Amino acid sequence: IIPEGVYIEVVVEGWGLPGSLETSEGTRTGFITVSKVTDKEKIKEFSEKYKVSAVNAEVIQLAKELNAQIVLANEEEVREAAQEAGFQVKGCLGILVDSVKNKILSPRQVIQDIDNLVASGYRIGDDIINGLKETLRRWSE
């Protein structure tokens, strides 16, 4: 489930950028649901309180309205805000690791996905990437 603001930012305004086609296809097939925040005033409050963009505040507010336990976020300030708001936070790498643990993807597939993320501009420290890849290699033995 993603808030309407994320859909607009990623698909409408960001068409052609990484993730736009996948998000569009996910909503078309029903894998991703777009949902509206009911209390729009809270978006402004969260944005000011946590010093995040309105779209990122919308993610946190929608999670609250849906009584979610986990928020998907990669940006550090959004992760911190979501944690402060009481949510467990997962990023792209955490989702990929979970996919191996749940036997959805193989460690080799996830290593390739990590390489693809980095090649497409995903920014994360080399030490984290290298450590994760080493762990995945051990899991594939």
Predicted segments — roles?
Residues L93-K103:
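Short alpha-helix plus adjacent loop in nuclease-associated cores
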Residues L105-E141:
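Long, charged alpha-helical interface segments
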Residues E76-E77, G94:
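Short, ordered loop/turn segments at secondary-structure junctions
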Residues I70-V71, G121:
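A residue-level structural signature of the nucleotidyltransferase/glycosyltransferase Rossmann-like core
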Residues E4-V6, C92-I95, Q109-D115:
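Acidic/polar active-site rim loop that often engages polyanionic ligands
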Residues V12, A82-Q83, K101-N102, A119:
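Short Asp/Glu-rich motifs
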